[in-house]
């Protein structure tokens, strides 16, 4: 059993925010792999899905970003899922737009959702870092992540979420390097291998 968590803020007001790309990716997995309907559980919206040979719970916390760990810890305890089998998909300022990296453990890089999960559950979970780029000035970060993706960004956002969903069985199987490589190749094949500016193909 895996616990796959997308981070974001609940409600229509935040649905298109850059901070909510984790929700978007989990929604793409749910659609593509015919998950059960999401229902309110564990202080979030949860669905069941089979990815390859692995059963997984998809979770979108309803606690707002800064309290994400409450929902994650509740679901993790209920299903007795080892921390190494908890996978968190989140926005990453320090990666270029349309890039993806997977890592286990490590720092939180100022991400309040990760900080909350680490405080509640521990640090040794897997993170799928979904690059959104950086606005260039630390003072602009708050507004940047809580603004919607621009119209020019939406094509790569949709392609990245689709690629994550396409190869989610590798992620569930623990084949992180293969998953990361497949997503990279898929994005390169769609022309997103070198996004110089937000939304722009090279």
UniProtKB/Swiss-Prot annotation:
Its EC number is 3.1.1.29. It catalyses: an N-acyl-L-alpha-aminoacyl-tRNA + H2O = an N-acyl-L-amino acid + a tRNA + H(+). The keyword Lyase does not apply. TRNA binds at residues 14, 64, 66, 112. GO terms for molecular function: peptidyl-tRNA hydrolase activity; tRNA binding. The active site is at residue 19. The record marks 9 as: Discriminates between blocked and unblocked aminoacyl-tRNA. NCBIfam families: pth. Belongs to the PTH family. This is Peptidyl-tRNA hydrolase. It comes from Methylobacterium radiotolerans (strain ATCC 27329 / DSM 1819 / JCM 2831 / NBRC 15690 / NCIMB 10815 / 0-1).
């Amino acid at each position: 059993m895996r616990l796959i968590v997308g981070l974001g803020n609940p409600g229509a007001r935040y649905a298109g925010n850059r901070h909510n790309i984790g929700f978007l990716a989990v929604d793409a997995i749910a659609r593509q792999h015919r998950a059960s309907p999401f229902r309110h559980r564990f202080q979030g919206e949860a669905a069941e899905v089979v990815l390859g040979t692995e059963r997984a719970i998809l979770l979108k916390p309803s606690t707002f970003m800064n309290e994400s760990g409450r929902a994650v810890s509740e679901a993790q305890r209920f299903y007795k899922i080892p921390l190494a089998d908890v996978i968190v998909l989140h926005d990453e300022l320090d990666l270029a737009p349309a890039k993806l990296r997977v890592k286990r453990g490590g720092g939180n890089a100022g991400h309040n959702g990760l900080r909350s999960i680490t405080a509640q559950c521990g640090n040794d979970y897997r993170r799928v870092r979904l690059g959104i780029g950086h606005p260039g000035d630390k003072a602009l970060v708050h507004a940047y992540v809580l603004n919607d993706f621009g119209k020019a960004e939406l094509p790569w956002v949709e392609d990245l979420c689709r690629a994550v969903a396409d190869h989610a069985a590798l992620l569930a199987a623990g084949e992180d390097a293969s998953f990361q490589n497949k997503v990279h190749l898929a994005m390169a094949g769609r022309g997103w291998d070198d996004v110089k500016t937000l939304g722009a193909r090279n």
